[in-house]
Amino acid sequence: MRLSQFHLHTTKETPSDAELTSHRLMLRAGMIRKLASGLYTWSPLGLRVLRKVERIVREEMDRAGAVEFQIPTIQPKELWEQTGRWQKFGPQLLKIKDRKDQTFCYSPTAEEAACDFARSELSSYKQLPVNFYQIQTKFRDEIRPRFGVMRSREFLMKDAYSFHLHDECLVREYENMKSAYSRIFTRLGLDFRMVQADSGAIGGDASQEFHVIADSGEDALVFSTGSDYAANMEAAIAADPAPRAAASEAMRKVDTPTQKTCEDVAALLGINLQRTVKSVALIAGEGEAQQFVLVLVRGDHEVNEIKLAKVAGLDEQRFASEAEIAEHLGSVPGFLGPIAPAKAIRVVADREVAAMSDFVVGANEAGFHLAGVNWGRDLAEPEVADIRNVRAGDRALDGGELKIARGIEVGHVFQLGRTYARALDATVLDENGKAAVMAMGCYGIGISRVVAAAIEQNHDDAGIIWPDAMAPWQVVVCVINPKGDAAVADAATNLLQELRDAGLDAALDDRGLRPGAMFADMELIGIPHRVVVSERGLAAGTYEYRSRRASEAESLDKATLLQRLQG
């Protein structure tokens, strides 16, 4: 490839709306261009990187025994209604109508369509197990698309769907896909972690995420120092709290006229924030099933909405209004508590709160809190659940200490069980000739997201630092004055061919730019290895070589250069 014949358009300007480093560098490097909110055109340069990721993903999926197919991105409403996700998926599901007034959606994921394909193609247990995968565009109508392709509305995804007669077979394929994903991200040259996760809108019995480690990551990842335990914040669990200590104080009412937060109350009373209790008023359910719920967490903790939604009857909830708070508690926000409510209410306390004694909580009276409060003596024992986010320093289940890092989710694997297959009547005849609902797994990798995540992990002030496997070219041969010196141009062309013959993905920068501008472009677009061919170097029998990760260039003869690059 000669760059004089390639579209390479870099810019020095930093886009004002680019918040993340990856977004800024992808725009400056000319990898993507914005078409509309959350929609990006991939340039020839960006597409080379995208295709590198695709190739590795495809190779490892094939190696793992999966077979490629392709599902339409436009899918009929009826399929999604059968699984209940037409409404459940929410406004992220882009709904459209054709000229015949038939309703479709633009696929954000494809469990329904994959299951429909399987039920039409598979009739006997002898055809199982099977794992179908595709690399296809998806669309989610994000309310606030941002961060470039990290959270765009349209994105490229590898999604796979496996079908099984028995659960044991599903578990084996789940482990097979986890291994395949580990190989993929290792080959891509990324620092990644696999963590336990919540299944979210996809559903299922078990799921794990793959995260690229990056300080800018949106997700908090929790690790234990005592074992290989790892989970995202939604699913992370700390060890049980220590047993509750005996009460040592009498309950008393304290004046807190303007102190509405646990932090302010703790400061006023001169106590540790850990001795306070935060009360969150919610309305759960709808219609006749609607109930007022007071959720309690320690003052220095935060409610985990995913865990809370798993508590019986709390899968759907909202914050209570001030009128609803007044009706049920006879109080106002900032002074809420479980003692003496105006009406009977449901109280759900986090495990840490249930283990507290002599704590401080709202008095259900404006301007007052209660101190020295104890369970059993001052108020009834609560309903107890794990409903908080863990914190760095918490004790882990294995006895170690929990640590927190940041990550960017790039892959997710699920054991779906039979939820989708049962809803869509996807059955095969088993060994006894009886209809059996197939067990299902699904496995996704955000291919366009991987590109952005790799940049977040691999960059410096000058630009991108691609791992070799993802770079648009592994090596670029830079020619000094290609039009003015035929010998230099010929030597560069010959070197390019030798690099290709050695199995390296190489290009020739023969655009005729000044050396400084040419080198700046190579650093910006992240070329791992740069070789300079110049008149002075040829006279000395050397080439100037610089690794993108090195601070200085070095002069090497051709044999040493080739050995280094093949390395």
Swiss-Prot record:
Record PROSITE patterns: AA_TRNA_LIGASE_II
Cellular location(s): Cytoplasm
Catalytic activity: tRNA(Pro) + L-proline + ATP = L-prolyl-tRNA(Pro) + AMP + diphosphate
Glycoprotein found in the keyword field: no
Pfam families: HGTP_anticodon, tRNA-synt_2b, tRNA_edit
GO MF assignments: aminoacyl-tRNA deacylase activity; ATP binding; proline-tRNA ligase activity
Record function comment: Catalyzes the attachment of proline to tRNA(Pro) in a two-step reaction: proline is first activated by ATP to form Pro-AMP and then transferred to the acceptor end of tRNA(Pro). As ProRS can inadvertently accommodate and process non-cognate amino acids such as alanine and cysteine, to avoid such errors it has two additional distinct editing activities against alanine. One activity is designated as 'pretransfer' editing and involves the tRNA(Pro)-independent hydrolysis of activated Ala-AMP.
Quaternary organization: Homodimer.
Protein name: Proline--tRNA ligase
